[in-house]
């Protein structure tokens, strides 16, 4: 999974990116690597994985990962050539979802580019740049499809749909809020890879005083939540300044620091939870002496397709899936014990994998 972090200058975007990636870097349980200065890979915190690794005394424990991209150049006027237009467009088109950092704190020492704090204005500023970029794509596609629409019924249908999407964007709406009418429209929309069709998570960056109650008394946060609800987007409250402090601590110190603030989870954990929920993701597990590993899949994925995440041969030659819930396995004390109690099941190709399933795939190629 790849998430692109965007935001106007001085909203805390780079602080958040650096804090999240550094937190992953310095935690012994969650290794981190840097691809380049603007890309970081952070492992997904998952207590189940560590418990299973201890259970099997695994030589290796491999968590799921999220790739964060710090999207540069997204400023007012970017669609007209301001900022680093080509760079940000190339980067943002590759991500699965957008994390939009919005400033919800007052601080006279940190000047806002527009002079005052207004997160909804900031959101609209960036959305407008994304809309302009999408309109360019649609206009190029319309020009191409128009050439064959008179002689090709399918092209004519697509042209009608393109005009529908264009009108939606010109009305100030995002592509993600467009209601499609059939599978053809879904397929066409997917091929355009529009920026405004990507799911969005709003990171409401607040002052330290607002973090304990999750921004309940912050009018800016409430405005962002109301806006996001109309897009079926996720909102999580974070204090980038606190995350920066947390990133300097080891695991034990981090837990104590969070407890002192009245928090049960870090910003990274909040973001992971919001991302999985928004994108409809979950994890199944494979476990053994050699390796215990988490695999990220879409909710609703069937066993053969889950097997294909490990290797294409597993999906192609799928026979059965040997399945046990991770908690049942731990409670029984051994795999044999879980089998004796009838908790290990043999599932076929129509089985829908559940979050926390520990699976051994049977296959033959």
Language model: regions and residue ranges:
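Fold-independent oxyanion-binding glycine-rich loops
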Residues: 38, 71-72, 102, 141, ...
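Long, charged N-terminal accessory/stalk domains
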Residues: 85, 89-191, 202, 236
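Glycine-rich, flexible loop/turn motifs
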Residues: 23-31, 38-40, 48-51, 80, ...
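Conserved G1/Walker A P-loop phosphate-binding module
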Residues: 1-111, 139-140
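C-terminal-of-GTPase-core extension/linker across diverse P-loop GTPases
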Residues: 2-6, 17, 146-352, 359, ...
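Flexible beta-alpha connector loops of hexameric P-loop NTPases
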Residues: 42, 74-80, 115-129, 149-154, ...
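Conserved nucleotide-binding/hydrolysis micro-motifs of P-loop NTPases
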Residues: 22-23, 48-49, 72-75, 103-109, ...
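Amphipathic alpha-helical transducer elements in NTP-driven molecular machines
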Residues: 32, 46-49, 62-68, 82-96, ...
């Amino acid at each position: 999974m790849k998430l692109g972090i965007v935001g106007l200058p001085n909203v805390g975007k780079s602080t958040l990116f650096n804090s999240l990636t550094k937190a992953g870097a310095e935690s012994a349980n969650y290794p981190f690597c840097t691809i380049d200065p603007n890309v970081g890979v952070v492992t997904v915190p998952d207590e189940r994985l560590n418990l299973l690794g201890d259970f099997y005394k695994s030589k290796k424990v491999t968590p799921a990962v999220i790739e964060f991209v710090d999207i540069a150049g997204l400023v007012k006027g970017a669609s007209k050539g301001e900022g680093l237009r080509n760079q940000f467009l190339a980067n943002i088109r590759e991500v699965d979802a957008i994390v939009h950092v919005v400033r919800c704190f007052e601080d006279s020492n940190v000047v806002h580019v527009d002079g005052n704090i207004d997160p909804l204005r900031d959101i609209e500023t960036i959305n407008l740049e994304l809309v302009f970029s999408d309109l360019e794509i649609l206009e190029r596609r319309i020009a191409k499809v128009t050439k064959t629409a008179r002689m090709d019924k399918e092209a004519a249908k697509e042209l009608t749909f393109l005009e529908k999407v264009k009108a939606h964007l010109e009305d100030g709406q995002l592509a993600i809020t467009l209601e499609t009418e059939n599978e053809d429209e879904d397929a066409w929309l997917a091929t355009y890879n529009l920026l405004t069709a990507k799911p969005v998570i709003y990171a409401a960056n607040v002052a330290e005083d607002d973090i304990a109650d999750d921004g309940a008394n912050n009018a800016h946060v409430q405005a962002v939540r109301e806006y996001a609800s109309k897009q079926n987007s996720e909102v999580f409250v974070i204090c980038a300044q606190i995350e920066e402090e947390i990133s300097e601590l080891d695991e034990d110190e981090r837990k104590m620091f969070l407890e002192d603030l009245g928090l049960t989870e870090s910003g990274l954990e909040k973001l992971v939870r919001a991302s999985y929920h928004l994108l409809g993701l979950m994890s199944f597990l494979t476990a053994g002496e050699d390796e215990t590993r988490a695999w990220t899949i879409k909710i609703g994925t069937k066993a053969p397709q889950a097997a294909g995440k490990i290797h294409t041969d597993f999906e192609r030659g799928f026979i059965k899936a040997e399945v046990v819930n991770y908690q049942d396995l731990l409670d029984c004390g051994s795999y044999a014990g879980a089998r004796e109690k009838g908790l290990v099941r043999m599932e076929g190709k129509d089985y829908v994998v559940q979050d926390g399933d520990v699976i051994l795939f049977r296959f033959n190629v």
